[in-house]
């Protein structure tokens, strides 16, 4: 069954920094590629997995978006990490616009 999203999702190609906790007192920060984004979440590609449910911070263009990992799927060049943004840090075009952004609602096949 296909899910219908309530908001537009945008494909993009943007370098981002991703931070998450890897223990009770240590966090890890890695470079990532922001693959897609919408008001409530996005997908980043990393070289290593992040456990589902982990608190995560995605930063690009000087803006930070907090959230939780919803999925982590192995791909050919790393892992695709789905992030649901926290209600107090939603994304909008007014905050940060990724490079090469394509609105999937306007793509026809």
What are these model-predicted stretches?
Residues 1-109:
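Structured alpha-helical
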């Amino acid at each position: 069954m296909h899910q219908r999203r309530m908001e537009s999702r945008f494909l993009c190609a943007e370098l981002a920094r991703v931070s998450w906790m890897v223990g009770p007192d240590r966090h890890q920060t890695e470079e990532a590629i922001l693959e897609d984004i919408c008001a409530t979440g996005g997908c980043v590609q990393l070289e290593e997995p992040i456990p589902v449910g982990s608190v995560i911070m995605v930063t690009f263009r000087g803006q930070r978006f907090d959230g939780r990992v919803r999925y982590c799927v192995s791909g050919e060049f790393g892992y695709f990490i789905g992030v649901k943004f926290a209600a107090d840090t939603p994304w909008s075009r007014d905050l940060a616009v990724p490079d090469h952004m394509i609105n999937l609602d306007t793509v026809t096949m």
